[in-house]
């Protein structure tokens, strides 16, 4: 009987176990379904060793680590050392075509120690013509797309660069997104998304929010444009020798007036000036300091005869002046300077010469970009900061899949980090919330600085904002300076200004040099200037020559 009574309890326990397994299985199925929807996904939950290949090239001596994000149990790929070059690559099982349908590129980065000078972008590599050798991955390895944050000096942008093969010349050309969004200035986890759509549209999202929209075929969105100009200046055309570009010329009939004195000086003595009353002619402007004494360690033989330092003569303070009075000079009313003939319109003026336009031999038309496929994913960067963490690298063919990953992998971490930061700010500044207010102001200013027509002033605005972030006690003054910059730009736009001369651009014929982002380009510019050591010895006057 006892055994029979235990049967219902056992069945109940079994039911609970089955329910737990079913619940767990449902989660696993959903995760599995998400993974199945992704073309490629790397969570870095497991060690990358053996799956991602670190470059053997000598320049890339930065150490990658499998590490937890600060404050989380979530693992990522960590840049562990400062001032190093890093290169690591993951070959895909199958190449990913970018020609048909939507393709979404997404990954997370966390700049745990900030980013002063360096890159945190990813390169989506095209198939290697000479065969794939992951251990030889470097900045020369050809890529199809480069996407992600880069910051150094005046550069502060989320790159989107694609390389496209000119079907006429056979050369690859880099096309850079114009006016890209700025890199978030905090140390939180951020997710970067690039959505390539079949209608030639590109969307750049940061933390799921659209920051930039562009069209691959638009000359307004990429530099240089994907579609070259139909004509180009004829490189063989030469300016005729008799071509006169002078709009104005000296009047050949003009004659110097007879009363024009070219030798008259610009200034003459003011004969009407008089010496002020009370001028002390016999008092020097400087006297020996009566309180000065010769240092005890002064050696006359080694250091020369000691002389007291000079101070201003106190008697001269109440007087209009001391020493010899000299008559001042004034501008010579008869001065005219060198004579030159006035300018008149040039009757032979033909305008500014330009070479004639000829058909561009490299011109082509496309209905859509002919992207190279993605065969591997690589991170090749140079950075002055450590603590950069890469995580949740995703390639998908549906932006809904990317959104799902953001919600499940990025958002929980970001929420925790944001709440922690808010609590720290409130603890540091009290309950008045000043720091939180400053953060909102900074975020707004960064967004304003991203407006395209402010691009030429962007670096100046960023410098002021970053100075305010680093010196909170000066924030108000610096914010005023930023406002002054905005106001000056506003007035310049309202009232106009001198427009720069229009310069015609020649289309690029050859592949642009492998642009690795300004981080690497700025490497040689970031060397510290050496300063001479200041002397600690007391100043000593040298022996006067007699």
UniProtKB/Swiss-Prot annotation:
InterPro entries assigned to the protein according to its UniProt record, in alphabetical order: Calret/calnex, Calret/calnex_CS, Calreticulin/calnexin_P_dom_sf, ConA-like_dom_sf
Start-end of Basic and acidic residues biased regions: 233-249, 501-511, 522-534
Function (record text): Calcium-binding protein that interacts with newly synthesized monoglucosylated glycoproteins in the endoplasmic reticulum. It may act in assisting protein assembly and/or in the retention within the ER of unassembled protein subunits. It seems to play a major role in the quality control apparatus of the ER by the retention of incorrectly folded proteins.
Region (P domain (Extended arm)): 232-365
Cytoplasmic topological segments: 497-546
Binding positions for Ca(2+) per the UniProt entry: 43, 74, 391
Membrane topology of the entry: Single-pass type I membrane protein
Name of the protein in its database record: Calnexin homolog
Localization: Endoplasmic reticulum membrane
Binding annotation for an alpha-D-glucoside: 121, 123, 143, 150, 380
Disulfide bond entries: 117-152, 316-322
Transmembrane segments: 476-496
SUPFAM superfamilies: Concanavalin A-like lectins/glucanases, P-domain of calnexin/calreticulin
